[in-house]
Amino acid sequence: LLVMPLTPFEIMMAKIWANGLAVLIGVTFALLVMVQQVLKVPIAGSLPLFLAAAACYLFAAASIGIFLGTLSRSMPQFGLLVILSIIPLLMLSGGVSPRESMPQLVQNIMLAAPTTYFVRLAQAILYRGAGFDVIWRDLLAMTGVGACFFTVALLRFRRAVTQTQV
């Protein structure tokens, strides 16, 4: 990786979108074939809008993953960081249990997690047929959180690459 003529930004974007594209293809298949055809569950909203929101979520989630990778020195340490951070993010985002049943402090802390916004906007699009005019705030917040994690991860990754080249 260090001898390739790529910048840390290009390496990170390739990592995010290579995996993200595979996930988006899987999500599209699951919604069109499994949900609509096999299970006969109608989707109320726009599939392209949902996929665009899912792409933004994948960017945010992958940015958190890369950030955690810059904090850890080994794969076992990274695994422990994932257990301590990603699992609570998923459990407290509103997808497993309603956010309204959580203490206000937890609800406020979870506003720093992109999963919270994605759960809200995915439910709005898929269940209620919401359009961009309804979900844009959640989409902007989710993308902003992802951009913050991406920026910090990029700075840390650049520093790590620079230190290993010296």
Describe the residue ranges of each PLM region.
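Short polybasic/polar patches that bind polyanions
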Residues: 2, 37, 126
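Membrane-spanning alpha-helical segments of multipass transporters and channels
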Residues: 21, 32, 41-166
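Membrane-embedded alpha-helical segments in integral membrane proteins
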Residues: 28-35
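Structural detector for helix-capping/boundary residues
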Residues: 4, 14-15, 155
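Short helix-to-coil transition segments within interhelical loops
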Residues: 1-8
